[in-house]
């Protein structure tokens, strides 16, 4: 991921500093679709000696903490941020952090990798490139993954061999070690914001506005949403802004800036509030992957017409607050239902009942918002970057204690078994067409050429890096040889 993306992440989280970053290299060998075989782990306990996950932890930071390098930090475990440009501290290359179980030193100095005190490497998923992974993998170090962004940024992590390279995870999945499924939802109050009066929206309809809004400038994505919207437009008016399927110009120059479309700019929010229904379609389909495309319409009092996380019902404020595209057998049937709601105010308002006092009845959602230890623009809580960092710190402190206990009594206290991430920590299936069947799409279709190949190449790359670690390889330059060998073995019968 280029430097501007990591800077944007830090800025959005309110981190004080952003160190300069260089662009990470991409990878692009082609691959053909083939099922992911049952994966037998090719390593044994000697290859990995990291750890078991420990429960939720807190994070506090003392402003007067001494700088790393003196007697108070010399024996502390080191956490090394490996991704360029992502280091949530200011200033310098290292900082002592105070967490629930004790202190660690966070660093971005890659020279520390070989130091026995360096207990964990922290990777940002979008930046992680198997071809550039630090080799050989050192037996005493955990690998920790932060990947709250779209799976399209790195499909290696959507396969078992890729995600199981890591010991600790912070992803959008509720099943990850440090889950971030509600990263785009500040709190329940965000959902309770009053909706505009229906008479105002009726006036916009009389002025020629469609009932349904589509605002996208990221086209040709793995979810193939534009293909579905194009078909839906045959049956119901859709006002499409942005670069994808555009049929209307935003009313002001400011709103024509695509950078504004992902913000909560007051002018943008007022404009979007004119619409009763918003097409809310994620760029990729994974359980628990939900973004502002879902939450922003609800904040504005519009009804999301949603395709994205298959588990989205688990997170809704009640059982009648979103229209799910996949509940309808065709775009035509969906269009007919939206048209019905558009003409029946009483039925439409049932979708906004969660905004009334006591209207949020989903206790699972409320509990997750209340008990998460990180916050969204909350000065009383750490952001999830620092929160995950402390989670890793406490994990490594506990692992050190377990190792010491085993050394003191090896017959009575067994070696701590390594904790390995599972496929459920991402849970992203192979991309499918937004409309129609994959076999009906021409082979030269841009979606088919790009995303199916990218998805399956992620599998090959994860298998290649796993094999290199198992073989204790030290030369990154051999990576593509491994990929080629795996590709040939998988496709030898084609």
Swiss-Prot record:
Residues 1-7 are cytoplasmic. It is found in: Endoplasmic reticulum membrane. Gene3D superfamilies: Glycosyl transferase family 10, C-terminal domain. The chain crosses the membrane at residues 8-24. It comes from the Eukaryota. Glycans are attached at residue 167. One of its GO terms (cellular component) is endoplasmic reticulum. Protein O-fucosyltransferase that specifically catalyzes O-fucosylation of serine or threonine residues in EMI domains of target proteins, such as MMRN1, MMRN2 and EMID1. Attaches fucose through an O-glycosidic linkage. O-fucosylation of EMI domain-containing proteins may be required for facilitating protein folding and secretion. Also shows minor alpha-(1,3)-fucosyltransferase activity toward activity toward biantennary N-glycan acceptors. However, this was tested with a library of synthetic substrates and this activity is unsure in vivo. This is GDP-fucose protein O-fucosyltransferase 4.
């Amino acid at each position: 991921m280029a430097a501007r993306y990591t800077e944007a992440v830090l800025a959005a989280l309110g981190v004080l500093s952003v160190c300069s970053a260089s662009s990470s290299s991409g990878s692009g060998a082609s691959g053909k679709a083939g099922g992911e075989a049952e994966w037998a782990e090719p390593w044994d306990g000697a290859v990995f000696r990291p750890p078991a996950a420990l429960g939720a932890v807190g994070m506090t930071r003392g402003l007067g903490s001494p700088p790393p390098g003196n007697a108070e930090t010399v024996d502390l475990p080191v956490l090394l941020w490996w991704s360029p440009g992502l280091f949530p501290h200011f200033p310098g290359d290292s900082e002592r952090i105070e967490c629930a179980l004790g202190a660690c030193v966070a660093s971005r100095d890659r020279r520390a990798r070989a130091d026995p005190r360096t207990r964990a490497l922290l990777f940002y998923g979008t930046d992680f490139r198997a071809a550039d992974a630090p080799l050989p993998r050192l037996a005493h170090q955990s690998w920790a993954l932060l990947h709250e962004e779209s799976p399209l940024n790195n499909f290696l992590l959507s396969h078992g061999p890729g995600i199981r390279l890591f010991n600790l995870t912070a992803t959008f999945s509720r099943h990850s070690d440090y889950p971030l499924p509600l990263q785009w939802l500040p709190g329940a109050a965000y959902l309770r914001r009053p909706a505009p009066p229906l008479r105002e929206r009726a006036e916009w309809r009389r002025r020629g506005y469609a009932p349904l809004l589509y605002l996208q400038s990221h086209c040709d994505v793995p979810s193939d949403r534009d293909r579905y919207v194009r078909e839906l437009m045959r049956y119901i008016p859709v006002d499409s802004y942005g670069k994808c399927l555009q049929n209307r110009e935003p009313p002001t120059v400011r709103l024509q800036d695509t950078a504004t479309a992902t913000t909560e700019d007051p002018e943008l929010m007022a404009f979007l509030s004119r619409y009763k229904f918003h097409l809310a379609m994620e760029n990729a389909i994974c359980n628990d992957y939900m973004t502002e495309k879902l939450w922003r319409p609800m904040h504005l009092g519009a009804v999301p017409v949603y395709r994205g996380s298959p588990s989205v019902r688990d997170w809704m404020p009640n059982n009648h607050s979103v229209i799910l595209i996949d509940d309808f057998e065709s775009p035509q049937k969906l269009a007919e239902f939206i048209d019905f709601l558009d003409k029946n105010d009483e039925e439409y308002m049932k979708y906004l009942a969660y905004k009334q006092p006591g209207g949020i009845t989903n206790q699972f959602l409320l509990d997750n918002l209340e008990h998460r230890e990180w916050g969204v623009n909350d000065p009383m809580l750490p952001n999830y970057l620092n929160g995950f960092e402390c989670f890793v710190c406490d994990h490594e402190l506990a692992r050190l204690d377990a190792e010491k206990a085993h050394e003191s009594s090896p017959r009575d206290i067994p070696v701590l078994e390594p904790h390995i991430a599972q496929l459920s920590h991402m849970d992203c299936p192979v991309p499918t067409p937004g409309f129609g069947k994959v076999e009906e799409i021409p082979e030269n279709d841009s979606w088919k050429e790009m995303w199916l190949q990218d998805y399956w190449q992620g599998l090959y790359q994860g298998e290649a890096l796993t094999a290199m670690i198992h073989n204790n390889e030290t030369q990154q330059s051999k990576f593509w040889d491994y990929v080629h060998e795996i590709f040939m073995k998988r496709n030898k019968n084609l």
